[in-house]
């Protein structure tokens, strides 16, 4: 059994095609069972569900309208009403940005920024794996990941990393899996990883992690 994980943060407006395609290949060609975990959607939903003080009018309105905004984004007819869509995105992004009171980690519906860590530096990615509990999504995802491991008992975990906006959280997820499920090898793949490996003279700086 292989557990395929789609990490935060990318647009949650469509299913994670990367792990779906891998799952189809593993099941159809290799006859290997696999399970899929959309940690991106789960993590964003958990952050949006948190209670927080309404420090200003905008935040208060966003909190009151949170459930309605989520229904709006899930409604296939919403693109016909751009003003509703825009208001929902602005308000939900407001709540996500306030998820970290210190302002050190800044998520929204399409991106994740860290004021002290860069997805372009391998040393910072390694630090995220070494200290997964410092990642903003750690508390959101720990229970979900543990439940998936308990249910499926995977022999391997695969993490699909396609965009820079996923990199820091993906390595925090790698660190979480290594600490909580140390007997399960982690395989890292995806478009971003492929681009790294195509660089002339590339050497894997993540040996021991993946």
Regions picked out by a protein language model, each given a short descriptive name:
Residues 36-108:
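Non-catalytic, alpha-helical, charged scaffold/linker segments
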Residues 1-3:
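Extreme N-terminal starter segment of soluble prokaryotic enzymes
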Residues 8-52, 99, 110-210:
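Glycine-rich beta-alpha loop elements in corrinoid/cobalamin-binding modules
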């Amino acid at each position: 059994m292989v557990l395929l994980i789609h990490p935060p943060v990318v647009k949650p407006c469509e299913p994670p095609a990367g792990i779906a395609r891998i799952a189809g290949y593993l099941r159809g060609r290799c006859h290997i069972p696999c399970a899929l975990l959309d940690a991106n959607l789960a993590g964003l939903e958990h952050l949006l569900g948190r209670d927080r003080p309404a420090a200003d009018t905008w935040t208060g309105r966003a909190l009151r309208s949170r459930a309605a905004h989520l229904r709006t984004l899930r409604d296939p007819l919403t693109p016909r009403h751009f003003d509703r869509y825009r208001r929902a995105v602005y308000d939900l992004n407001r709540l996500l940005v306030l998820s970290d009171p210190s302002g050190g980690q800044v998520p929204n519906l399409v991106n994740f920024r860290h004021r002290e860590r860069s997805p372009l530096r391998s040393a910072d990615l390694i630090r995220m794996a070494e200290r997964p509990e410092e990642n903003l999504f750690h508390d959101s995802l720990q229970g979900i990941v543990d439940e998936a491991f308990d249910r499926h008992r995977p022999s391997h975990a695969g993490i699909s990393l396609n965009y820079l906006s996923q990199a820091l959280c993906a390595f925090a997820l790698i660190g979480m899996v290594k600490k909580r499920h140390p007997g399960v090898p982690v395989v890292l793949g995806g478009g971003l990883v492929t681009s790294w490996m195509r660089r002339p003279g590339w050497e894997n700086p993540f040996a021991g992690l993946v």
